[in-house]
Amino acid sequence: MSVFTETPTNAVEPFPFLCYNKIKRSGGFSMIRNICKDEFFLSRKAEPATADDLSVAQDLLDTLAAHKDGCVGMAANMIGVNKRIIAFDNIGEYMVMFNPVLVKKSAPYDAEEGCLSLTGTRKTKRYQTIKVQWQNEQFQTRIKTFTGWTAQIIQHEIDHCEGILI
């Protein structure tokens, strides 16, 4: 997700697991991928992620970090991989979610968002508070409530996993 024109306030505390202060990669190689702009590919629902997809998550983090000046979140399909993996800036630290699902949402509002995969900005409905279930890098299930800006980023990236283009 690229820079938004509306930024709700955020009262989320930093996350203790699956956050990255800096990009980690065994072997020291960075894999920055090209951004996919193929709307047909982006509109496909993503396949569930597995432990075999850990390297995809790292590539996603590397690519997100390379675009940090104009991007706060990415889904795997944005780098050409049709898997349910998202990465985003969670209050200054990168976080990855495997197989994220919105389980609860409240307080709808209208937002205008941009995306590195699409031209321009588009209006969409978002929710101020969301509860998300996902798996961490050990594929343990986690559930957490997010609010504000972070919630908006997560919703945008989960939309990518569902094949929904803003």
Segments from the language model and where they lie:
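N-terminal amphipathic/basic-hydrophobic helices that include classical n-h-c signal peptides
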Residues: 1-30
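Positively charged
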Residues: 20-166
